[in-house]
Design a protein with these regions (language model features):
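Helix C-cap/helix->beta junction micro-motif
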Residues: 56-59, 89, 138-139
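A short alpha-helix capping/helix-coil boundary motif
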Residues: 28-29, 60-63, 85, 111-112, ...
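EAL-family c-di-GMP phosphodiesterase catalytic domain
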Residues: 37-39, 66-73, 91-204
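Catalytic core of bacterial c-di-GMP phosphodiesterases, primarily the EAL and HD-GYP domains
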Residues: 5-78
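Glycine-centered small-residue hotspots that permit tight backbone geometry or close packing
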Residues: 4, 8, 87, 99-100
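Alpha-helical scaffolding segments of alpha/beta enzyme cores, especially the outer helices
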Residues: 17, 47-51, 78-88, 106, ...
Length: 204
């Protein structure tokens, strides 16, 4: 394993620790752990990932592997075997940074990932490729559209058939005042501890 491999494994382990923390706190919160496609072509790297997954003893469905930098046929073909090994361990597969190329769509047909993540702003200038229209109806997968800041972005997300939409148009920023009024909020309590005030705003 190279130094980069070891660094990625350390970050992956930290991600597993975070998921485990929430799971033991009684919250079933899945986590998507990003991983460059080229690293998934290494058998020794997949062996190391498998050891980490088997040792964490998390239930199936909590660990999601986010594959990114999947840009050419070589990276797509070389990572398939490793991803199949991950799937046999109960890991769900997500494709990050989807751009709608024919090669990526063929890869989706082959792998059938559980999630596809699309940065919708990339289609503002030239519009959606024909292959992207009604994408949600073509595959049994969840589609996540991000960076929705314009009405055009939302229209494109609807044309794709996205199941989840994120961005400034969908989620305006939450002010500190609103956060302080959120009941049972760790963030609110952290802010309150830094800036004490006579009014507890519901946080006790």
């Amino acid at each position: 394993l190279t130094a980069t491999d070891k660094q990625l494994l350390r970050l992956f382990m930290e991600g597993l620790d975070t998921i485990t923390y929430w799971y033991r706190s009684g919250r079933f919160i899945p986590g998507i752990l990003p991983m460059p496609a080229q690293h998934l072509a290494s058998n020794s790297f997949i062996d190391a990932l498998s050891d980490l997954l088997l040792n964490c003893r998390l239930p199936v469905g909590l660990v999601n592997l986010g594959v990114h930098k999947l840009q050419d046929a070589d990276s797509m073909d070389s990572c398939v075997e490793g991803l199949l090994r991950m799937r046999r361990l109960g890991v769900l597969i997500h494709l990050l940074d989807f751009s709608g190329t024919s090669a990526q769509i063929n890869w989706i047909k082959q792998m059938e990932p559980e999630g596809i993540h699309i940065e919708i702003g990339q289609f503002r200038a030239e519009g959606l490729p024909n292959e992207m229209i009604s994408l949600g109806q073509k595959f049994h997968t969840e589609i996540y559209a991000s960076n929705i800041t314009l009405v055009k972005d939302l229209e494109n997300a609807m044309s794709i058939g996205a199941h989840h939409c994120y961005g400034e148009l969908m989620m305006p920023p939450i002010s500190r005042h609103q956060i302080l009024h959120t009941s049972d909020s760790r963030i609110a309590k952290a802010i309150f501890s830094l800036h004490p005030h006579k009014n507890l705003n519901g946080d006790k």
